[in-house]
């Protein structure tokens, strides 16, 4: 089978290509230029070239920087301006990696596209679903919630049945040169964020604009440094007059540049809503597992789909719901779909 392999210049994607080559597939290596950091691209393209030379496969470099900026990067900035907490990876995957890059792969005559994601694909009743990775500590299925089933059918995740701790030894044994590759120390999972998301926002918008902090009764009780510097649940970085106990951000009013704070129990909710992006129209209401943040434990909840809104009800208190984050619905370890929390 002819497969396009997305190479990032790192160990995981290189080993993904190696394992597919060992299985006898015809491969085309593909590097995507997404964020606007040529210095990083130069280094990672060299790394990807080394992997391709070792495997004896061609490498294509696709420049999607303009598309990435308009559909992912600018949306990231806009969401923070609106007081939301966005997750750009959930946009990038369907639009860039498994959108534009998949389209290009199909034009090259490839049947499928592979990446180093920690996830799996499972076919149920002739429909392809994303399944959680074997290694639950590294599972990335959450970021893939917006993919259509027709797209999922064309995906290959060679690392899905492996444990992260085992991959580096396997990769170095198979491709010894990987141990000598230079990489950048990534500060977090967002590829275009150098130090912190605030530093990225500062390049485009005014983030250091002092405003007031109010309690749940609407009384002014302190000040903050600028609403974009805070996310739901944060308890530091703002001043409260005479505070004797911790206060947490429970709301953000972007238009007024105000924070609303309360006690930890004020972060609790028993329901939430999300604008549907990928749950199928015939979704049956019932008890499912949901995740409202990437690094959160799946929580059992009652989920229903009404028109374009996913409605979720919890038996017990659920904490730290932030507008703009992805709500993802699972049946056991099978991802059914999700939406954006409103």
From Swiss-Prot:
Q: Which residues form the signal peptide?
A: none
Tree of life domain: Bacteria
Task: Give the location in the cell.
Answer: Cytoplasm
- GO biological process, any: tRNA wobble position uridine thiolation
Which residues does the UniProt site feature Interaction with tRNA point to?
A: 117, 325
Disulphide bridges, residue numbers: 92-191
| Keywords on record | ATP-binding, Cytoplasm, Disulfide bond, Nucleotide-binding, RNA-binding, Transferase, tRNA processing, tRNA-binding
InterPro entries documented for this protein: MnmA-like (IPR004506), MnmA-like_C (IPR046885), MnmA-like_central (IPR046884), MnmA-like_central_sf (IPR023382), Rossmann-like_a/b/a_fold (IPR014729)
Which Gene Ontology MF annotations are present? Answer: ATP binding; tRNA binding; tRNA-uridine 2-sulfurtransferase activity
Q: What reaction does this enzyme carry out catalytically?
A: S-sulfanyl-L-cysteinyl-[protein] + uridine(34) in tRNA + AH2 + ATP = 2-thiouridine(34) in tRNA + L-cysteinyl-[protein] + A + AMP + diphosphate + H(+)
Q: Record keywords: Disulfide bond included?
A: yes
Q: Which HAMAP family match?
A: tRNA_thiouridyl_MnmA
Q: What is known about what this protein does?
A: Catalyzes the 2-thiolation of uridine at the wobble position (U34) of tRNA, leading to the formation of s(2)U34.
What family classification does the UniProt entry report for this protein?
Answer: Belongs to the MnmA/TRMU family.
Q: What is this protein called?
A: tRNA-specific 2-thiouridylase MnmA
Species this protein is from? Helicobacter pylori (strain G27)
